[in-house]
């Protein structure tokens, strides 16, 4: 019963439950991560709030987080995706964010800046989402996209429909 209560509390507060392990985030790790989020988001033209929302949801800002499925690091890159993006050390904050933001930029081009599809593709893989689009009806993916939208809106500080946007306000 106590474990169930903690799980419910964690879901309510919005911690990154996808990552099951990894040392707690340290303040210096968060500062370093924020630096690279800003750097790579600008470089790849990805909205900073989207990157922050992914990190919050995926790892709760833990640099060495590892999920039950094997995704690693702040942005929870799967090993195959990390290799494809040239990320050799997933616990390396710079490499993980660089690869993760590059992947988000690629997904944004693939899905024409529709953040719902970008989030779904990030979570489930781009192939299935590219084939089925918004008709993809996996309950886990739908729940993930809803949580990402809520986290994104908090990060961006705007009421956004989580659809297409290239607003300079969110490109900070």
Tell me what each language-model feature is:
Residues 6-16:
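Bacterial N-terminal signal peptides
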Residues 20-172:
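Catalytic glycan-binding domains that act on GlcNAc-containing polysaccharides
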């Amino acid at each position: 019963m106590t474990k169930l209560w903690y799980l419910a509390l964690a879901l309510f507060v919005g911690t990154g439950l996808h990552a099951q392990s990894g040392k707690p985030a340290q303040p210096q790790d968060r500062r370093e991560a924020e630096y690279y989020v800003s750097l790579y988001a600008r470089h790849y033209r990805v909205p900073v709030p989207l990157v922050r929302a992914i990190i919050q949801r995926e790892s709760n800002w833990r640099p060495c987080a590892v999920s039950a499925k094997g995704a690693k690091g702040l942005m929870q890159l799967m090993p195959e995706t990390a290799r494809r993006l040239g990320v050799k050390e997933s616990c390396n904050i710079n490499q993980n964010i660089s690869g993760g933001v590059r992947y988000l930029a690629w997904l944004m081009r693939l899905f024409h800046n529709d953040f719902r599809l970008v989030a779904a593709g990030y979570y489930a893989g781009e192939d299935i989402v590219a084939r089925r689009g918004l008709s993809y009806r996996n309950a886990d993916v739908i729940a993930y996209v809803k949580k990402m939208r809520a986290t994104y809106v908090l990060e961006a500080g705007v009421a956004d429909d989580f659809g297409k946007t290239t607003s300079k306000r969110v490109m900070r």
